[in-house]
C-alpha cells in the first residue's frame, strides 16, 4: 500500500514539474507568435500534409521582415538559410500541436529560436522624452525613417521628435 502511495505522489510531482517547465509565450515570443500566425493562415487541406506546410512556410517567409525574417532563417525557410529544421515545425503542425509545444521542440533543436525578442514600443503620448536615453531618441527617429542632421545634444533630438510627432503619432479618440 505504501509503495502504491509513493508511486502516486511521484507521478503527481513529475506532472507538476512538467507543467511548470512548459514553455510560456513570453519565453519565446517571436517563435510562438510567428508559428501561431502561420498556422492560422493555413487552410484545412494544407494542415494535414507536412510537405505542403513546408512549402507554405517558405512562401510565408518571403514576406516576413525583422525578427520573423530571422526566425525563418533559423528554421531553414529562406533560400540563404545555412541549416534546416523545417520538419520540426511542419510535422508537429500537421498533428495540430499548439504553437507553444512546437516552439518547445524547436528550442531543443536550436536555442537561438527563443533568443529572438520583440523590441518594446515606446508610447509617445505618455512617455517623458527627457527621461529617455539618446539611443532611444535616435531609435524613434530611425523607426520613422527620419534623421536629425546637426543634432548633438539630447535637447536637439527631443526638439526634432516634437516637431515630427504630429506627423507620426497616432492619437486615439
Curated annotation (Swiss-Prot):
Which superkingdom does the taxonomy of this entry point to? Eukaryota
Cellular component terms per the entry's GO annotation: endoplasmic reticulum; extracellular space; synapse
Query: Which UniProt keywords are given for this protein, alphabetically ordered?
Result: Developmental protein, Disulfide bond, Secreted, Signal
- Key word Nuclease present in the record? no
Q: Give a yes or no for keyword Chaperone in this entry.
A: no
Extract the signal peptide range.
1-22
Q: Which cysteines are cross-linked by disulfides?
A: 28-114, 31-103, 61-72, 148-151
Report the record's Gene Ontology biological process terms: dopamine metabolic process; dopaminergic neuron differentiation; neuron cellular homeostasis; neuron projection development; synaptic transmission, dopaminergic
Subcellular localization: Secreted
Q: What does this protein do?
A: Required during the maturation of the embryonic nervous system for maintenance of neuronal and cuticular connectivity. Essential for maintenance of dopaminergic neurons and dopamine levels.
The UniProt entry's sequence similarity note says: Belongs to the ARMET family.
- What is the protein named? Mesencephalic astrocyte-derived neurotrophic factor homolog
Q: Which gene encodes it?
A: Manf
Amino acid at each position: 500500500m505504501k509503495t502504491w502511495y509513493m508511486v502516486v505522489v511521484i507521478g503527481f510531482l513529475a506532472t507538476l514539474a512538467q507543467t511548470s517547465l512548459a514553455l510560456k509565450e513570453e519565453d519565446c515570443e517571436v517563435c510562438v507568435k510567428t508559428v501561431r500566425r502561420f498556422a492560422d493562415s493555413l487552410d484545412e487541406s494544407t494542415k494535414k500534409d507536412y510537405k505542403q506546410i513546408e512549402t507554405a512556410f517558405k512562401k510565408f517567409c518571403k514576406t516576413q521582415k525583422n525578427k520573423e525574417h530571422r526566425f525563418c532563417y533559423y528554421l531553414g525557410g529562406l533560400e540563404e538559410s545555412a541549416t534546416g529544421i523545417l520538419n520540426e515545425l511542419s510535422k508537429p503542425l500537421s498533428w495540430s500541436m499548439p504553437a507553444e509545444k512546437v516552439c518547445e521542440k524547436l528550442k531543443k533543436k536550436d536555442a537561438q529560436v527563443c533568443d529572438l525578442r520583440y523590441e518594446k514600443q515606446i508610447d509617445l503620448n505618455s512617455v517623458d522624452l527627457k527621461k529617455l536615453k539618446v539611443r532611444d531618441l535616435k531609435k524613434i527617429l530611425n523607426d520613422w525613417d527620419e534623421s536629425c542632421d546637426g543634432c548633438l545634444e539630447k535637447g536637439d533630438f527631443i526638439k526634432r521628435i516634437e516637431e515630427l510627432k504630429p506627423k507620426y503619432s497616432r492619437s486615439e479618440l
